[in-house]
A protein has these predicted regions:
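Conserved micro-motifs of the catalytic ATP-binding
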Residues: 812-816, 854-857, 920
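Conserved glycine-rich
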Residues: 943-950
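Conserved catalytic submotifs in the C-terminal HATPase_c
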Residues: 839-854
Length: 976
């Protein structure tokens, strides 16, 4: 039974097109997102591991090693069962630092470009045999179904088709940041297809083939001797070596790394994969023994690796044969697409970009895209070249062994990355290189010699399919041994130690608190424009800011450090960790000479993420840290901790409530970024020699507040450079109570004085006034009448003085419930009252205050204030002078200035001008209580009054009144 090449080509291309349409439907959002991102899709996408070697070659493994073929499934299943301590930490590292391949991961950990180059070159030794295996399998199956064309030509045609589809599937995006969800869905689809194909074949064997001889059990009983001769006992074969190889494949094989880590969009899906993927492999392995036994029974004349296809041909079942062919095509195509994509990205990052980058004027993203496409074609053509030279003469098992043994050479470096922070680049590179050379000498060259019949004059060991595992053990053992010995005998660099902390699952990385040369995000864009071009630099910086949920402009030192780290991670996904690390270090350097210390805030943030994973003493210490942190957070007094350079490291809840600035907005920034009045107040205190300040007044929230400030110096210890702790205590209530107490005492004293004056003077004055009135009624003598008028005038004067004393004594006893007051209206009222006096007729009053000056207070008492101030200005002015009243709004206050051009006030007088009974007017023209009363009223309104004199040319006075500003625009009717 044969098929035409056209039929096979139509079937194969049709299948690949269906895969592409599935991927395209996902990218166009034709399918619900909950389907695409379901953990089951992720689990099935890991089925890319089941390549043509699993679909076809596992039957050959069963023929060689008996039940040892299960190592193919059990080795990698063991790695996924151990995912909490093996795969999950790697996933976290790759997601955090945007590492898209094993070369990226190892170059990041061992901090040398040679690590990336070496891993990339050796990965080629892994990839080429694995791709050759797929090409061989598809070429051989095509030849079995149609023997009219040479198998080499069929293999070449398959390679060309796969180059096209690999580019269509994965080389349409620039950065691995853009997940290929369509590719993941397509690989999940092909996993289902090959699982269905092999299960259907197994069912046909069980229920259609063996019933002819009484069932499978009867046939096995009859052919025990034949089966025993063709199988190897587990203890005699390479069982343990196979387990180790396939265990390492979970991380080291490029297609598994890509699907498990790079394309992972939901870290939680790895939990389902830890049991779901082993279950998938177990189900797939169930059909392998029946297929092998059916091949024996039907006497299929193909290699045991192709028994699956041979059974369909032997049964002359066209549907079964085509289903198996499509299943094998799915197995081979999936791994080819994913492997070439991941390997091309690896070579681009570590072999091309370190050597050549396009000029900034070119479209960097487009150049990356075409370079990746070219590398995909080169890798597949290299695999085809190896197939033409050697691969066609090696069976599937030999090709698979070559690839997986080479892959296991990465295992020491991976384990050191996770569990041995002291390992270093020298040990890693020495072990990897010598282990790989041992693989070449003891495995690759002997297999090539056997396949081609060459005589290679290098005294090669006699390696064959029976003892290859010894060479594999020697190569891996030498790798491990050198890795350990050289790492122990040499020291790490500082960069390696930092990377080791970032990668180790037993430690929390300790980021440093070091300022950048760039002062803001715009300067970072400018710095990166030199190597990347303006467009790419701006796009990458804005993307990093968006990832960190930061504003488009950022200048906080802590945020800039986070931005730098995020940029390095994002650029790592674009061009690899080596190039991105060098680029960031060169164009975004830290400031030289700055004192290096650990970033306590970032360390605490990371410890919070590790809290549930800590145990034992570490957990107890973390609980103690959290308790102390909570104590500081809940203190009723504001507490902030500062680094020596003024960067805020801690800002507790009370501090946030007092200042109105949240901890997230100020932590990591300099104190100078705090808004007024807090920034200037705290900076002035920090720069002073004072360790304590009591009752420091600031105006905020429309009223004055008083604060106590205290600071303490933190001495350097434990690698930390020290710093300052500042305590902020709200003393407003205490100050208000003290003011009220003093005010009450003063009023009581004045009240007693006024009462005494009224008692001692009031009654006699009343009597004198009565006597003067009696004189007016009892005489017509003009002289006596004039004398009586003078007596009454003087008694009225004394009465006014007594009334002033009484008014002063009652200052402060007015209601504290204030209304919204239009200050401009009060000034106009005061001016109108003054104009009623004859002394104001030749004085011009100019009110230049804006119409919306509002405060909370007593309108009548504020009118009294301005009557006093304007009256004093009038008394100091000459006829024809002008008195100006100016007003302005500030952040929290309104400011009113009363300016005259009078004779001014000398300095000695200014020092006593607000004291009671102090006056510069002539005797009989003032009591000295006016400005004292003004001062009391302004204090009642939480305001402030000051006098500057002279203003200019030795003349003039400016009285400034500051009152809390109110935002209300409706004014009460108290003005009337």
């Amino acid at each position: 039974m044969t098929f035409s090449l056209g039929q096979l080509a139509l079937l194969g291309v049709g299948y690949l097109l269906s895969l592409f349409l599935a991927a395209y439907a996902v990218e166009r959002n034709w399918l619900p997102r909950r389907w695409v991102r379901h953990p089951l899709i992720y689990v099935l996408s890991l089925g890319v591991y089941a390549s043509a070697w699993a679909f076809y070659g596992s039957v050959g493994l069963a023929n060689q090693y008996g039940y040892g073929f299960l190592a193919y499934y059990m080795g990698i299943s063991g790695a996924f069962v151990m995912s909490p301590i093996l795969l999950r930490p790697i996933l976290q590292i790759t997601r955090t630092y945007q590492l898209s391949s094993l070369a990226d991961l190892l170059a990041f950990r061992y901090r040398t470009p040679w690590a990336g180059v070496t891993v990339s070159i050796i990965m080629l030794a892994v990839v080429v045999p694995m791709l050759t295996l797929q090409i061989t399998a598809i070429g051989d199956t095509l030849h079995l179904l149609n023997n009219e064309w040479p198998v080499e030509s069929l293999a070449l045609a398959y390679c060309v088709i796969m180059i096209i589809f690999a580019i269509l599937f994965g080389a349409r995006h620039v950065s691995p940041r853009e997940k290929h969800e369509g590719l993941v869905f397509a690989i999940a689809f092909e996993s289902v297809l090959k699982l269905v194909a092999i299960l259907v074949l197994g069912a046909v064997v069980m229920f259609s083939v063996f019933p002819q001889v009484g069932g499978l059990e009867q046939w096995l009983t009859t052919n025990q001797e034949q089966l025993a001769q063709q199988q190897v006992r587990l203890q005699d074969g390479p069982w343990r070596t196979l387990l180790l190889m396939f265990f390492a494949a979970a991380v080291a094989m490029p297609h598994m790394f890509h699907m498990a880590f790079t394309e992972n969009t939901n870290p939680g899906a790895l939990r389902q994969a830890s049991w779901g993927f082993p279950l998938f492999l177990l189900i797939m392995s169930l059909s392998v023994p029946p297929i092998l036994w059916a091949g024996y029974y039907l006497d299929v004349d193909t290699d045991p690796s192709y028994f699956a296809l041979g059974i369909g041909l032997a049964l002359e079942s066209v549907p079964l044969t085509l289903l198996v062919f499509v299943g094998g095509l799915a197995a081979a195509s999936g791994i080819i697409i994913v492997t070439t994509l991941s390997t091309a990205a690896m070579f681009l990052n570590h072999m091309v970009l370190p050597v050549y980058k396009p000029a900034p004027r070119y479209d960097f993203y487009r150049w990356l895209l075409w370079m990746r496409r070219s590398l995909i074609a080169v890798i597949l053509l290299l695999a085809y070249g190896f197939y033409r030279i050697v691969g066609s003469d090696l069976d599937l098992s030999q090709l698979g062994i070559l690839g997986f043994v080479a892959c296991s050479q990465f295992l020491p470096g991976i384990l050191g990355l996770l569990y041995w922070p002291q390992s270093n680049r020298r040990g890693f590179l020495a072990g990897l290189i010598l282990g790989t050379l041992t693989w070449v000498y003891s495995l690759l060259l002997p297999f090539c010699e056997l396949a081609l019949g060459w005589e290679i004059p290098f005294y090669l060991p006699a390696t064959d399919e029976g003892n290859w595992h010894l060479s594999a053990i020697v190569a891996t053992g030498i790798n491990f041994l050198l890795f350990v010995i050289i790492s122990l005998s040499s020291r790490q660099t500082a960069a390696e130690a930092a990377a080791a902390d970032a990668c180790s699952i037993d430690t929390v990385s300790r980021p440093s608190r070091q300022p950048l040369v760039a002062l803001n995000s715009n300067e970072i864009i400018t710095a990166l424009s030199a190597p990347l071009g303006r467009y790419v630099a701006e796009r990458e910086v804005l993307q990093a800011l968006e990832d960190l949920e930061l504003p488009s402009y950022e200048d906080r030192p802590s945020a800039l450090r986070r931005l730098r780290a995020r940029l390095e991670a994002n650029l790592s996904g674009l061009m690899g960790p080596t190039v991105s690390h060098d680029l960031v270090n060169r164009y975004l350097p830290f400031r030289e000479g700055a004192e290096l210390s650990e970033d306590i805030y970032q360390i605490e943030q990371r410890l919070e993420g590790y809290h549930t994973r800590l145990g034992g003493l570490a957990s107890e210490l973390d609980n103690l840290r959290r308790y102390h942190r909570q104590t500081l957070e809940c203190l009723p007094m504001g507490v902030c901790s500062l680094a020596p350079d003024g960067e805020v490291l801690m800002w507790n809840q009370a501090m946030a409530e007092l200042t109105g600035t949240a901890a997230a907005d100020v932590t990591g920034s300099h104190m100078s970024r705090l808004p007024a009045p807090w920034g200037p107040m705290l900076l002035d205190f920090l720069q002073s020699q004072d360790m304590h300040r009591h009752k420091h007044r600031i105006d905020t929230g429309g009223r004055p507040h008083w604060f106590g400030l205290h600071k303490a110096v933190l001495q350097p210890s434990g690698g930390q450079p020290g710093g300052l702790v500042v305590l902020l205590e709200d003393q407003t209530e205490t100050q208000v109570l003290e003011d009220e107490l003093m005010h009450s005492e003063r009023l009581a004293s004045i009240g007693r004085l006024a009462a005494g004056v009224a008692h001692e003077i009031g009654n006699p004055i009343t009597g004198i006034d009565c006597l003067a009135q009696s004189i007016r009624y009892e005489t017509d003598n003009p002289e006596l009448l004039e004398m009586a008028d003078q007596i009454q005038e003087q008694t009225k004067r004394v009465s006014r003085i007594v009334q002033s004393l009484m008014n002063f004594s009652h200052a402060g006893h007015h209601s504290t419930e204030h209304d919204i007051v239009d200050v401009t209206y009060c000034i106009n009222e005061a001016i109108q009252l003054l104009k009623l006096s004859k002394r104001s007729q030749d004085i011009l009053f100019e009110n230049d205050c804006p119409p919306e000056l509002y405060t909370k207070g007593d309108a009548q008492r504020l009118v009294q204030v301005f009557v006093n101030l304007l009256g004093n200005a009038r008394d100091a002015s000459e006829p024809g002078d002008t008195i100006w009243v100016q007003g302005e709004r500030e952040e929290q206050q309104i400011r009113i200035k009363v300016i005259d051009n009078g004779h001014g006030i000398d300095a000695d007088t200014l020092d006593h001008i607000f004291e009671p009974f102090f006056t510069t007017k002539e005797v009989g023209k003032g009591t000295g209580l006016g400005l004292s009363l003004v001062y009391s009223i302004i204090e009642e309104h939480y305001g402030h009054i000051s006098i500057d004199s002279p203003v200019a040319s030795g003349r003039g006075t400016c009285v400034t009144v500051s009152l809390p500003q109110s935002e209300h625009t409706e004014v009460t009717e108290t003005h009337s």
